Amino acid sequence: VSHLLVNQIISHHTGLHDFGDVENILKERLLSKEINEGDISINKPLLFQEFIDSPFSKSKVEWKHFHHLSRMLFSCLVDADRLDTERFMDVESWRKRGNSATLADLLPQLEAYMQKLQSNAADTKVNRIRQQVKEQCSRTSSSEKGFYSLTVPTGGGKTLSSLLWAMKHAVSHSMNRIIIAIPYTSIIVQTAGLLKEIFGEENVLEHHSNFDPDDIKDEENREKAKLATENWDYPIIVTTNVQLFESMFSNKTSDCRKLHNMANSILVLDEVQMLPTGFLRPIVDALKAYQEMFGVSVLFTTASQPVLSGLIEGTNPKADFKGIEHIKEIIPEEFALHDQLRRVKLSIDDTGKTYDEIAAKVSEYNKVLCIVNTRKDAKELYDRLPNDGVKLHLSRMMCPAHLHDC
């Protein structure tokens, strides 16, 4: 424990050190200066008493998860140090932090929004299924903390229903925030836009490479968002898988600072099948650690759930590892959503085609989506299409602003 706490203290300006380096670093620092007796007084109050008395400290820490505990304590110290300095040096910025709505405050707004959608929706099969999914999410939301999955095909209302489950689950367990991690920035922009429409931009933080807080028109919200990217002190955060998991394994002060605000929160991993298989073992271990030690609930959402429980096979037998022990599916099998929402019939033609042949085939339809393997293929095919009507080229050769305009 002494090494654990010492490492936080000597690292909070430089980045978290490896455990093996702590003793040598400490010796060097102690030998380089004379220590005043007042510096080591034992009459000062125990600053960690609140943490020691908290539920998190009562959980058993496996050795393989010890580095997550180290980072969590490091995060607490770094953020407290930065906020204390900010309160002294820049009190105006300090006053702009926090004061956000709680999830309990925001839940009625979501329920009202979903009720309005339902009232205005036509009585169709798809809308009845969406309502069924919503009601099931609402019914199961008060279940105990843990791992959950929501498997809903495209068009089944997964985005709003998963958010309803997460918010009601959070309110049931007095949890602090919802963190939504998505693999693609294009989906993040759409999701964040919807959430801001429901809750207001002052309650939804976007944190990804394509978002510039300077684009926020309201000055107060703009400054709050800039500050909140440092420590995620918002009720709802929408971010990338990269931002989330790099922070969990980083030793940098800037990355680790936000980690303590992930404790007692809900992680919603959208399109979970896109988790990189090469990093699946440390990701799964991290999620298990955060659930067991820091009171986190995890919701996996997708149309096609990957295998994350039981024995997960690696690239060779030695790389096999134990997944999550129990993931509770929210939607029961008898709902048969995949059968009810099946809207696509696959017809596979494995013969080779030239660009001109594909262009001719595409031109036969009034509305058509053509997906190809590479950006070069997309450009070649686009150039061969006739100019009558509307044709759009979408690829990462375009800048994000132009993609958004399309």
Regions found by a protein language model. Name each.
Residues 167, 174-199, 208-211, 307, ...:
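Conserved Walker A/P-loop ATP-binding site and its immediately adjacent core
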Residues 1-112:
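Accessory nucleic-acid engagement/destabilization modules that flank
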Residues 200-249:
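Inter-Walker segment of RecA-like/P-loop motor cores
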Residues 177-188, 361-386:
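Conserved strand-helix element at the start of the C-terminal RecA-like helicase core
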Residues 206-220, 373-376, 391-406:
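Conserved helicase motor
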Residues 144-167:
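Walker A/P-loop
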Residues 241-245, 253-294, 298:
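SF2 helicase catalytic motif II
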Residues 304-363:
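Interdomain hinge/linker at the junction between the two RecA-like core domains of SF2 helicases
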